[in-house]
Amino acid sequence: MASHPIVHTDIPATDPKAAGAFYAAVFDWQIQTDPTFDYTMFQAEGGPAGGFTLIGRDEDAVPYHYRAGEVLIYIGTDDIDNSLRKVAAHGGEVVLAKTEIPDVGWWAVFRDPSGNRIGLFTSVPRG
């Protein structure tokens, strides 16, 4: 059986850098900004990494629109295409098709039968 752990979490924020400062002060999370993607990332001890993504970004600028109150978890998968086929076969809906993150991997977003939006992620093979 394949492993499908939660590998990443996106927390929407009106000001990602301020959100990072808040969580660092309250929970001692390690915060780092990736200038390549203008993305503020966090690492919580003992948990998966994540990031603070800007609410209300221009829909044309990013392939997925984040909303306040919708924390998005990402499930790791070795085969996003196969996972999306299974989602559709079992009553889910693909919201964002497989999309490349250059030099990082691929991601996608689906809606489960209860209406929850969940992300999928596959890393670029390292060799």
Locate the predicted segments by residue.
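Vicinal oxygen chelate
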Residues: M1-V7, G20-D78, N82-R111, S123-G127
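Conserved beta-strand-loop-alpha-helix junction that forms the acyl-donor binding cleft
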Residues: A13-D15
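Short glycine-/small-residue motifs
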Residues: L120
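Glycine-rich acetyl-CoA-binding "A-motif" of GNAT/NAT acetyltransferases
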Residues: R117
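Helix-turn-helix
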Residues: D10
